[in-house]
Regions:
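Phosphodiester-processing cores and adjacent nucleic acid-binding clamps
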Residues: 1-194
Length: 194
């Protein structure tokens, strides 16, 4: 299977998800996944997820949820994904700084071995004024991460698809990658948190 689910929260994010790493990996194996990712605002799920993936011969991808600084009033919701041992070390250094909002200067120092995905999940991303305003910020993050930079987008309806046309054009003109990035918080509908 060529699609990789990256934005899956686990039950280690109390009140955010019901997904247990072992069950998630087992189900992914049944569906033919070869690579699988998790995200969170802590690292607690990493060991059990790594063990479950190793047992099922699935490549594990680890992401960390951050709030990314913006020159606008609304910061960006984003994720740093570990690509290498150096990336893991750099992520630990970023976490050690205990910043609520991560800025460009900190990322300049510790971006090696990491990928950045900005989640384009706010209606503002579909408005021309906002896209023009954030263009400078986005250019700086893209220059820093280069091919390891992307936008994550979730389209849940035909209306979402129509609304996102302007955003797609914005990304196409600037050659920004867009990834399917739906949030997964449960494996079965009956497990959904209210």
């Amino acid at each position: 299977m060529s699609y990789t689910t990256l934005c899956t929260f686990t039950a280690y994010e109390i009140g955010e998800s019901t997904v247990l790493p072992f069950s998630y990996v087992k189900r992914a194996k049944e569906l033919g996944y070869e690579t699988l990712g998790i995200v969170g605002s802590n690292l607690h799920a990493y060991p059990s997820f790594a063990d479950a993936c190793a047992k099922e011969n699935i490549k594990a991808v680890f992401g960390y949820k951050i709030t990314l600084a913006s020159s606008e009033t609304i910061p960006y919701r984003a994720y740093l994904f570990i690509k290498s041992e150096k990336g893991y070390q750099n992520l630990l250094k970023i976490i050690k700084e205990q910043k609520k909002v991560i800025g460009l200067n900190l990322l300049k120092e510790f971006h090696e071995g990491l990928s950045l995905i900005i989640q384009a999940d706010h209606d503002l991303f579909y408005q021309d004024y906002f896209l023009t305003t954030i263009s400078k910020d986005i250019t700086q993050y893209q220059k820093l991460f280069q091919e390891d930079f992307a936008f994550g987008i979730t389209l849940l309806s035909k209306e979402d698809q129509e609304d996102s046309a302007q955003f797609y054009q914005f990304c196409k003109e600037r050659q920004y990658r867009i990834l399917a990035f739906p949030e997964v918080r449960y494996l079965h509908k009956g497990d959904a948190l209210d």
